[in-house]
């Protein structure tokens, strides 16, 4: 009896910063597309894709809070990084919740055009859940990762406002709430990569 050949190993996930850049580029393309006039069906699909993206970013960001820097102790994650990233994840999920019940999530509809910017954005955000499962890298890569997420958040906030143009009144209110929530997420992300201030030290000789 011959043995079956072993399945090829799965490719390693992309580096967190590479994944974050791909999401940022997809968010920019989607925001540009959603700023154009669209049919009611396309508008519903765009809002659903925004919902799915926010949900998956929230899930992925919770895992990014466990980022481990490679190298030696002189290259640590910034002080308070896990807490600020976790707070940003809560903001993403809260903005997602603000759309829950207003429109059913259809962001990964199998019949959607795979080349549509919103569909590509959904897949990019979904990929982060795997890519950031056990995140590690240098502190420079961490800084790039977070800055790319900040850019993504900015694009999504602009997209939410664009989508209010053709939205019914109730949905428009919720989309504006998304914009506010993403502004809060940006604040948390920027705090996550700020260089901590100097530690409080005992005064040296001759100081008061």
Regions from the PLM with identified roles:
Residues 1, 205-208:
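Non-Sec secretion/translocation targeting segments of pathogen effectors
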Residues 1-11:
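Long, low-complexity intrinsically disordered regions
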Residues 9-11, 18-52, 56-184, 194-204:
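Long, low-complexity or tandemly repetitive, helically biased scaffold regions used
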């Amino acid at each position: 009896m011959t043995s079956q050949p072993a399945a090829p190993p799965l490719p390693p996930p992309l580096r967190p910063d590479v994944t974050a850049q791909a999401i940022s580029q997809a968010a920019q393309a989607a925001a540009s597309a959603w700023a154009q006039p669209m049919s009611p069906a396309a508008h519903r699909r765009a809002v659903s894709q925004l919902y799915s993206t926010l949900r998956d970013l929230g899930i992925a960001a919770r895992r990014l809070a466990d980022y481990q820097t490679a190298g030696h102790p002189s290259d640590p994650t910034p002080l308070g990084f896990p807490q600020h990233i976790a707070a940003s994840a809560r903001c993403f999920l809260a903005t997602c919740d603000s759309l829950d019940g207003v429109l059913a999530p259809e962001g990964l509809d199998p019949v959607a055009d795979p080349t549509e910017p919103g569909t590509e954005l959904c897949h990019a955000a979904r990929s982060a859940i795997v890519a950031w499962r056990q995140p590690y890298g240098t502190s420079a890569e961490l800084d790039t990762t977070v800055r790319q997420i900040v850019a993504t958040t900015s694009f999504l906030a602009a997209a939410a406002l664009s989508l209010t143009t053709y939205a019914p009144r109730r949905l428009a209110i919720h989309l504006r709430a998304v914009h506010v929530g993403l502004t809060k997420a940006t604040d948390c992300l920027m705090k996550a990569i700020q260089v901590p201030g100097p530690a409080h030290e005992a005064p040296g000789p001759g100081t008061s």
